């Protein structure tokens, strides 16, 4: 009997924080455990879009706070130390409005998020705000000028102070004082862990590596996460933290087929077995999603939504083919469809060229980073055979920033890469109008 179900109960396109929803990645979880329990070091989580970096970072944060449920789920509980290092954690998702290191540090020092913000580490008990004022737009000074704290029976001490016109030193004061300050009030933890997600979007990251190196100690640890095929793409001056990052470099690659299948067995459990996916359907989604959990989650969610619309909880081949028809016609995924329309414009020829590039077979093996690269020359003869005559006039829109871009130029002439590999997988599905 059909029962309406919330698609979000089993599938989500958001960052996964709940360990029960997290699937696979046992090797990466083990790497995270090793990095967290190292006395010193920097953690760097990097990889392509859509592979689940932010979700992994949130699992790392859970373990840093002392919750090792994800390790138990991954069968790694025997590797958890008798006394694992515990952290006060700060999490901040960067955005493209942050131009440089100084602006990032200013954001961190003014973040009042109750769960993840740096300022929440100022103890509430006995907290005194000595001065608060708005800085001039041209000043590098921060809004928070001085915070004092103290508990009855203890000396009132200066917790953290902002040095006018010196954002970096102000940040140093905050992070180096936070562990001692909070250990006076709560059960003791070993260090503070500052996690910077989407670190790659910061325009100029020069100097961040040396700042991280100078602050890293047994009581202060940093973790950065973002898009990049190597550490150099994520941290420009990564050589300054080379020794510290050795154990904490965590490269997130596309999922194996078995891990992608586990997304659907996990979803069925979360749906309390009210929803079922035929094995052949799951196999097809595994192939279509190409190891990107974000895309697999989107397709799963769309399937359950369509099941609700027609009154069924059983996603078989017939139902899934109807779901695919909606995806191929651009009705299911508004964000990916918007990317597609922006890239091709009103040109049928450009749409055909984009599909040819997306479908180009790579020489590298599957689940290898080289897979994303396409060679324009390999597509020319096929494109011309389909009547696409002016390829060089069609390409600029595909690489221009204002239209996406759909493609980014490689180091060698005529070599390109899809900026978003999930978008590439979508283009392969999308039928030409």
Name these PLM-found stretches.
Residues 101-109, 257, 261-265, 282, ...:
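An amphipathic alpha-helix signature
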Residues 25, 54, 292, 420:
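Short, conserved phosphate/pyrophosphate- and ester-handling motifs at nucleotide-, phospho-/glycolipid
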Residues 1-46, 62-76, 80-85, 433:
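A short, basic N-terminal segment
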Residues 7-9, 328-433:
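C-terminal leucine-rich, beta-strand-based interaction scaffolds used for sensing/assembly
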Residues 4, 8-10, 184, 188-193, ...:
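The catalytic "switch" region of P-loop NTPases
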